[in-house]
Amino acid sequence: MNNKNKITHTFQSEVKELLHLMIHSLYSNKEIFLRELISNASDAIEKIRFEKLYSLKKYRENLYTPKIKISIKKDEKKIIISDNGIGMTYKEVIKNLGTIAKSGTKSFLNKIQNIEKKEKNDFIGQFGVGFYSSFIVSNSVSVYTRHAKEKKNIGTLWISEGKGKYSVEKISKEEHGTIVELSLKSSEKEFLEIWKIKNIIKKYSDHISIPIEIENYDEKTKTISWEKINKAQALWTINKNNITKKKYQDFYKYLTNDSEKPLLWSHNKVEGTQEYINLLYIPKKATWDIWHQENKHGLKLYVKHVFIMDEATQFLPNYLRFVKGIIDSQDLPLNISREILQDSSITHILRKSLTKRILNILNNLSENNIKKYQKFWNVFGIIIKEGIAEDSENKTILSNLLRFSSIKKGNIEQTLSLNEYIKNMKKNQKKIYFITSDSYKSALNSPNLEIFKENDIDVLILSEKIDEWMMNYLTEFNNIKFQSVSKLDDTIDSLLLKKNVSNEKNTFNEFIEKTKKILKNKVKDVKITYRLKNTPAIVLTDTNDMSTQMAKIFSAAGQPIPKIKYILEINPLHPLIKKIEKIKNEKDFSNWIKIIFDQSILSEKGSLENPHKFIQRINNFFIS
């Protein structure tokens, strides 16, 4: 070491701010400094691997064994991380360690951007930022480095306490690569324990493809040995043809802490503009917190086999939050801490691709393994329904995944697909009919279904809270429109078998006009209908008005509800209506009409604005 060569520099102002931020607030988990340094060492080795491919005269495969080594010096309170990667020149040290985001990786990629080889995307990150995390646990950091293209013994030493200045000097270093020496703070003694370092490496860097070795010193024999800590090959990087079913299942359990086997999984390697590997699992059961909006649900993110974060939500839409697994990107951009993904175009591409992959997997399952898909739907169907509103781009395939109960199915289990419904439609049926209600039983007994049952027309039954909201976005399927049986539908008459119907429309004109005058602004309209059999009247909402179920959803959420004016449809063939039609006393006629209207409202909404008045009218008829 020649002190005459030592030159002191001041950090770039942004670096000073970064150091202060990192040391005092940025990283909540101090141990990730080791992850960052190992990641940087891995980057440096990947770079020299590239040089071996394109400068074969200088670097020979059989003369180079990549390695990352870690030594702990308890007495000196030091951790030393070394690699035999590409290293840095004197100028690169000043450029990369004195400024932000100029680690050499970005410049290196710019240099090779015209090379038509996939290896050019084989480097990650911004070295400088991660390197600064060393100061979270260190009083001082020393970096010894020599670039692989420099002559032997021409190296550089960089030293800083992270307080605004750093020194650089030329030194003699025989091997290319970098040694990072951390002088730990007195409060960070835990990182001097070998078991602690091993656990951190297994947690964050177990899947680094380069062997990571730790130094063991035997006090008795006074000998040093090196122990490999990481597996050095991630499961998802292995050819899927060489992975057993049990290995996939065991990895899922390790990944999720789920005691059960997954329902299914998908393992793919994608090469092209973006290169990444994904290993995705669909569980058999939902997690306890799947409805907790404050909890994040996402994939484990790796970049070049380096663990970056849990619950990376950027890669899947919220309605696929039940999916577990990993994504391992070769060139994904990261932000300053590596813990929050940049909202980049690459992220959007990966999200789009992964979403389509999962939906296609589910669609294939629904077509080829109905029993297994039904198990999936019974657990996660209600979450898939969210996608209809959230993901217009994939609405078609999402619609294929939907399952319903119906009046013909005769049970609450949702097993009917829309394709099956359409296949069984009547010849003259032009719409897909559905009903929404608070419960399956309530929907099944709705008077709105009477004429459909009589005419053997199936109706989808939707009784989950999300259904009404979903149907506002699901307006058609395969060019066939959906029609709520609780809304006005002037085309329904073409489906009905009208028996014993003469000229009621003409003879009931006076009845209709009198009813309109009695109900006044309580109704939007009063009409004759033949869709009823055992019920005297029903109320419907107009085509573009808010439905009763949607109003209930708004009310439950504390949202203001617009005044709903119903359309009263009267069954002229019902005995009670015929009896009322003959009443001459205007007061009695009026009371009967109000009772019929309240009954219809009660049947539709399940409640009345003034139930006491309704009961009073009923009682008056009992005693009259």
Curated annotation (Swiss-Prot):
Molecular chaperone. Has ATPase activity. SUPFAM superfamilies: ATPase domain of HSP90 chaperone/DNA topoisomerase II/histidine kinase (SSF55874), HSP90 C-terminal domain (SSF110942), Ribosomal protein S5 domain 2-like (SSF54211). GO terms for cellular component: cytoplasm. The keyword Zinc does not apply. Belongs to the heat shock protein 90 family. Residues 339-552 are annotated as: B. This is Chaperone protein HtpG.
